[in-house]
Amino acid sequence: MKHGPIILIEDDADDKDVFQDILKDLKVFNPVVWFKNCDEAFSYLKTTSDQPFIIFCDVNIPGLNGIECKRQIDDNKELRKKSIPFVFCSTSVDQKTVDEAYTKMTVQGYFQKKNTYTELKETIKLIVAYWEECKHPNTK
C-alpha cells in the first residue's frame, strides 16, 4: 500500500465519518487529512512535504468549489509536479460539471456518491485499488 496521506476535501462531517469508516473496513490505514474547504486544502498542499496518495474532493463546497480548487492545483507548477491523483466524489453529477472536469483540467475520476454504505464502499475500494496499482511520476 502506498503510504501517503489521503486528502479528503468535504464540508459534510457525516460524509467524512462514513468515508473514514469505509477506509477502516477496507483496511486502508493511510492517514486521512480532512479539509472542510478548498482554501485550507490548497494551503496544506502547497506547504506539506508529504506526497499524498490521492485527493478525494466534493464538488459542492462553500467558498471555492471543487472545480475551482482543482483548477488552482493545476495552475500551480509545484503541485503539478507532485502528480497527486485527484478524484471527484460528489452528489452533483450534472453533465455540464462532469464535462468541465474532464475537458478543462486534469481530473483522474468523477464519481457519484452512492446512496448506501455498501455501494459507496465498493466505489472507494475500486478507486483505491486502481491508484495502488497505477504508476505515475511520483510513484515511490
Where is each model-derived feature located?
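CheY-like receiver
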Residues: 119, 123-125, 129-140
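His-Asp phosphorelay/catalytic-motif detector in bacterial-type signaling
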Residues: 2, 28-29, 50-54, 79-85
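Acidic, metal-coordinating helix/loop segments flanking the phosphotransfer/catalytic sites
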Residues: 34-54
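Hydrophobic/aromatic residues positioned on beta-strands within the core alpha/beta folds
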Residues: 89-90
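Active-site residues of response regulator receiver
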Residues: 57-62
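Conserved acidic segment of CheY-like receiver
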Residues: 3-14, 19-23
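Acidic catalytic/metal-coordinating carboxylates
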Residues: 37, 65-71
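Alpha4 helix (beta4-alpha4-beta5 surface) of REC/receiver domains from two-component response regulators
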Residues: 68, 93-111, 115, 122
